[in-house]
Design a protein with these regions (language model features):
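Short, well-ordered beta-strand micro-motif
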Residues: 22-24, 34, 97-101
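C-terminal beta-strand-rich structural cap/linker in extracellular carbohydrate-active enzymes
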Residues: 78-102
Length: 102
């Protein structure tokens, strides 16, 4: 399953839809958040994930989850919630792939 996050972030001061792109992908046991940054500087992104994304993907809104950044191997924890932005740093002209185990 695929869910585009651009429309939920057009008026978001913590996400530049002209320079960043984000979407969710889900399979049977994992959720992936993919964020790309086409800016010439690192950015700290605050990403809105709308409640409709949780409904569409069959996920619980507001769960505290461990995740792995697949390109760096870093592990972290965060809350996937429509009430709070998901915050992550994305290097210049690169992307991050975040994997949550379901």
């Amino acid at each position: 399953q695929f869910f585009d996050l651009e429309y939920a972030n057009f008026n978001n001061p913590n996400f530049n839809t002209n320079k960043q792109f984000a979407f969710l992908r889900k399979d049977s046991d994992s959720l992936f958040l993919i964020v790309t940054n086409f800016e010439d500087s690192d950015v700290n992104i605050g990403l809105n994930i709308p409640s409709h994304a949780f409904e569409y993907l069959g996920l619980s809104d507001g769960e505290f989850k461990e995740y792995t950044e697949l390109l760096s191997g870093k592990k972290n924890k965060g809350i996937l919630s429509s009430a709070n932005q998901f915050e992550i740093c994305v290097p210049k002209n690169e992307g991050v792939i975040v994997k949550f185990k379901l």
